[in-house]
Each structure stands twice: as structure tokens, then as C-alpha cells.
């Protein structure tokens, strides 16, 4: 249940407990030490404030690391409002610290409006997303920091239904989440039938954090429905090859261990999907001594897995033998309820893809005779009529954020440095970008890495002019073509 801002507060907020701000500020201060890229950007731009007055909405996990990103954007002058992009991923200490701010108190907060707490319901989640997109005077954002595309979805669907002249009845939706989306949009439509058209017209663009959200953006572009320019942060090398691999390598195990407290060594683990996230997950499980099997549809990724020493099988072939299941495909219907009915007793089932549709949790809840036995928050046992049970992590949502605290600060510093650079780019080029999805240029990728090497005591070799001429690159880079695959 959220704590709402009291009457007379300097701004609106909805968080779990504002009195958690002291611990949150301590966590934030420690995280800053591990996030050199963001701290350099603060030092570089805080005097000139290139984002002064720019309204930025965030829909991204409200963690300690995100708190450092938020305070970087505000240091650059932005007017920020924030919601989480997952009902379980908020760290309530971080949310409180951001509301209170570095110089405020619970009685007189001096931070920014946050609408997020751990354990939101779906109606609360979509209301919070709307609040993060709406300023007190009714204006919308000029720019969005998105993770998974929910903020972009709300604007795009709102625009679509305003154009059609009506919002479909929520009862027509085939799942609970979309019913909540429609209910939120219907409420807005009844108040202002042109709201989302006004918001879209004022948008400079969006920067998208994750694979699933990027897929949504490219689909909108393909259909001619992209309402504003977008920057694909996910496919920056310094995001996908670090956050997705090494972040998941760290946080997957953290989530499984905190929830289950079982010995992973010696057990059989099935990683479903061998993209960048799957690669990190497979490394982490093997590092704990698990016997790792991969499922894949892509022959290239499958061969990569085999060359790393993993077996590649179909789930149907191994479902009865696996102890730990991890989905990380970014797709839907990966583990069906019929598959869960065949799993061994007390098999652990979790997801580290962005949305909760990789595991058929709806089908699980509706299975005839199923018993739900909560173990602890975000860790539930589901017992089938035959007596065997599975252990579900975070209700099929992101287990690393639902059961733990997500990726560590250092790797998120690279992702969020990219996000900050993308926000600067959107504002600098406002009005000059097409309605398409852009990627960050290679020289910025390399610059992001350079900002982080010093803290790891890395000493780069420097090309001579002769060497640079020989391979036809500048002495200071960039060193690889856009087609190069790291």
C-alpha cells in the first residue's frame, strides 16, 4: 500500500514509506562510487545544465542505481517524474531517497515526484505510469526514459484510441494487464479527448533501455505508428554486451539464492534462450556448478552454446529431469502449464525476460485442483493434484529484481550513461530527427567505456599514427565498423 503525499506537500508522490530515505541515501551514496560514468557527466554538465527545464518522464525500475541516474538528469537541469516499469522491482529505500532529495526532509521533501513501490497491483502500476507522464498543469513529458516500452505504449495507445474516437471497453481485453491499460486510458479519455495528441505533439523522443521495448519500437516504426523519434539504447555495445551479459550473470544467481536458498551445484538447469541475457545466465549457473542445458530457436545461438560446452535440447526432451528453469527469450508462451505439470517435484521456475508472459502463470492459476501455497514474498509453491509442486519466482516476472535488487551499480553505470547521452542527444537534435529508431554512434559507445576504465586500473595501448593509418582508423577511435560484432 502506498504512502501518498500529504496535503501541503511541495509536490505529489506515492511511495511505500518516506521514512526509508536515510537508508536509501546511504545506499545511493555508495552506488555513486561504483557509477563513474554518471558522476563524470554530472561534473561535465552540471554548470551548463543542457537539460534545463526539459520535462523528462521515467518508466524504469526504481532501484538505487536508477536513483543515481535520476539525480544525474536533475543535475543537468531536467524536470523529472518517475515510475517503475515492474510491479515488484522498486527498492522502497531508493524511492524514498529520491522523493526527499539530498537536502530535504520527510516533512519538506526537496527531490522529485516518484510513483512506485514494491508490490504494486496492476491497476496501481498503470495509474502510476500515467502520473509519471502527467505534470500538475496537465502537460506531458518532452522526453521519456523507457524500459520495456510501457510509457511509450500508453502514449501510443491513447493516441490511437483518441483518433478512433473511443477507448474499447476494458471488459473486451483478453488479459488482466490490458484491461488495466484500457481502464486507465478510458479514465483519461473521459477527462480530455485530445490529451495524448497534445502529449505526442510535444515529444522530442524516447530512449529505450531493454530488448523487449526495442522490439516494440521497431514494430511501431514498421507499421508507421511511431509518434516520435526513438533511440535504441539496448543495442549499444556498452549496454547489451555488459548489462545484459554480466549484469544477468550477477543478478540471476542473487535472485535464485535469496528466494530459494537451495544448493545450485550438481543440479540440472535449463536456460531458455541464448541471447546476451541467456549467455550471462548460463555462465552464472555453470559457475555455481550446475549442469546447464540450453533451448534455442536460432541456429547461430544454438551453435554458440554448443561451442561453449552446453547441451542444446528441446524442453519436451528434458522437462522431467530439470531442477531449475530460467526463461530469457523476450517471447511469449515459453513454459506452458502442461510443461509445469510434468516437472519434477519442487522444480524452481523463474523468468529474467522483461515481461511475465514467458511462463503461463494465468494457466497455472486456473489449473483444475491446483493449490497455491505462499512461501515468502515473491516465492510461491504451486501444488498439482498429483501431489508434486513447483516453486515459482516473482510470479513469473523478473526474478532478479523481484527476489533481489537487480544488476550491480558498475554495470548499470554504463547503461545509464548511455541513457543520459541519449537524452542529451534527443534534446540537442529536437525537431531535426525523423520518426524512426536510432542507435547511438560508435564513438559514444567507446566514450562510455573510457569513462569506466580508470576505476578498474585499465591501461589502454595507444596506436601510433602509422598503425592507425595501416588499419584506416583514427588514433583516438572509433576502432571498429558499425558491422563489427563484439
Swiss-Prot record:
It catalyses: S-adenosyl-L-homocysteine + H2O = L-homocysteine + adenosine. Binds 1 NAD(+) per subunit. The lineage of its organism: Eukaryota, Metamonada, Parabasalia, Trichomonadida, Trichomonadidae. HAMAP family: AdoHcyase. InterPro entries: Adenosylhomocyst_ase-like_sf, Adenosylhomocysteinase-like, Ado_hCys_hydrolase_NAD-bd, NAD(P)-bd_dom_sf, S-Ado-L-homoCys_hydrolase_CS. Adenosylhomocysteine is a competitive inhibitor of S-adenosyl-L-methionine-dependent methyl transferase reactions; therefore adenosylhomocysteinase may play a key role in the control of methylations via regulation of the intracellular concentration of adenosylhomocysteine. Keywords: Hydrolase, NAD, One-carbon metabolism. This is Adenosylhomocysteinase. SMART domains: AdoHcyase, AdoHcyase_NAD. Its EC number is 3.13.2.1. It comes from Trichomonas vaginalis. NAD(+) binds at residues 210-212, 244, 273-278, 296, 331, 352-354, 400. GO terms for cellular component: cytosol. Pathway: Amino-acid biosynthesis; L-homocysteine biosynthesis; L-homocysteine from S-adenosyl-L-homocysteine: step 1/1. Substrate binds at residues 63, 147, 209, 239, 243. Gene3D superfamilies: Adenosylhomocysteinase-like, NAD(P)-binding Rossmann-like Domain. It holds the Pfam family AdoHcyase_NAD. One of its GO terms (molecular function) is adenosylhomocysteinase activity. It comes from the Eukaryota. One of its GO terms (biological process) is S-adenosylmethionine cycle. Its cofactor is NAD(+).
